[in-house]
A protein has these predicted regions:
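Acidic, surface-exposed loops and disordered segments
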Residues: 1-218
C-alpha cells in the first residue's frame, strides 16, 4: 500500500474485538519490524516485552491508567517498550560483534573506528545526563515503525504513554535487568462499535506547519 494512503487510513483503536487474535505469522512480522527499527548510531537501546495471555495483561494492568484498561483487557497482543539504563562498553561490544557478524564491518581497523565513534556519542549523552531522554527518543522511533507496520498488515494499535513507569518496572522486575519501561502499545483488531474507526482524521493544514527556510525570517 502507498504510504501516504496508509497514513491517511491509520487510526488509534479505542476498543478492540476481544475475539479476534493476531495470527502468529503476523506477530513474527511485527517483531521483525521492531528488530529492524532505526536508531541513532545503531544504538538499539530497547527491549520489547511481549504479552498475549490474560495473565500477562493482569500483570501490567495496575500500572496502566484506568481509562486505558479497556485497551489492555481487549487487545490481542501488547508490547511494553523499555530502554536500557545506560549503554556500557559491554553492550557496545555486543552491538559491534553483531555488526561484524552481519558483514557491516570489514576489518579490525574499521571495527575500532566504529566502536570509538559510537562510544563518543553515547558518552556525550552520559556526561550531559541525557541518556534516558535520548534512549526514549529511540524507543519512539521503534514505536512509530510498529504502529505503521501493524497498519500495513491490517492490524490496529493504540500507543499508550500514560502509565506509571516506576510501578511497571516493579511489576515486571525490570530493575533486575537494568531496563526502564517508557511506552506500551496494544495491538489487535478494532471492535465494530469503536467510535474512532469512522471519525474523520483531523490534522493542521500544511500551510500552518511547513515553512520555506529561504523565506523564513531569521
Amino acid at each position: 500500500m502507498d504510504f501516504v494512503k496508509l497514513s491517511e487510513q491509520r487510526f488509534t483503536a479505542k476498543k478492540f474485538d476481544v475475539n479476534k487474535k493476531i495470527p502468529r505469522d503476523d506477530v513474527e512480522k511485527l517483531k521483525t519490524i521492531l528488530q529492524l527499527s532505526p536508531s541513532s548510531v545503531n544504538s538499539q537501546p530497547w527491549v520489547f516485552l511481549w504479552g498475549t495471555s490474560d495473565n500477562s495483561k493482569k500483570r501490567v494492568r495496575p500500572a496502566i491508567a484506568d481509562f486505558n484498561w479497556n485497551r489492555i483487557d481487549t487487545c490481542s497482543d501488547f508490547v511494553v517498550i523499555a530502554v536500557r539504563k545506560g549503554l556500557d562498553d559491554k553492550f557496545q561490544h555486543t552491538l559491534l560483534d553483531q555488526e561484524i557478524k552481519d558483514g557491516r564491518i570489514a576489518n579490525e581497523e574499521i571495527a575500532k573506528e566504529c566502536f570509538e565513534s559510537r562510544k563518543f556519542f553515547i558518552d556525550l549523552r552520559e556526561r550531559s545526563g541525557q541518556t534516558l531522554n535520548w534512549e526514549t527518543k529511540q524507543a519512539y522511533i521503534a514505536m512509530t515503525a510498529l504502529l505503521y507496520g501493524a497498519a500495513s498488515l491490517g492490524i490496529d494499535s493504540t500507543p499508550i504513554e500514560v502509565f506509571d513507569e516506576n510501578k511497571m518496572d516493579k511489576l515486571l522486575n525490570l530493575d533486575n535487568y537494568g531496563v526502564h519501561s517508557v511506552l506500551v502499545v496494544t495491538l489487535g483488531y478494532d471492535a465494530e462499535d469503536d467510535h474512532n474507526r469512522t471519525r474523520p482524521k483531523s490534522r493542521l493544514e500544511q500551510s500552518k506547519i511547513f515553512f520555506d527556510l529561504d523565506k523564513f525570517p531569521g
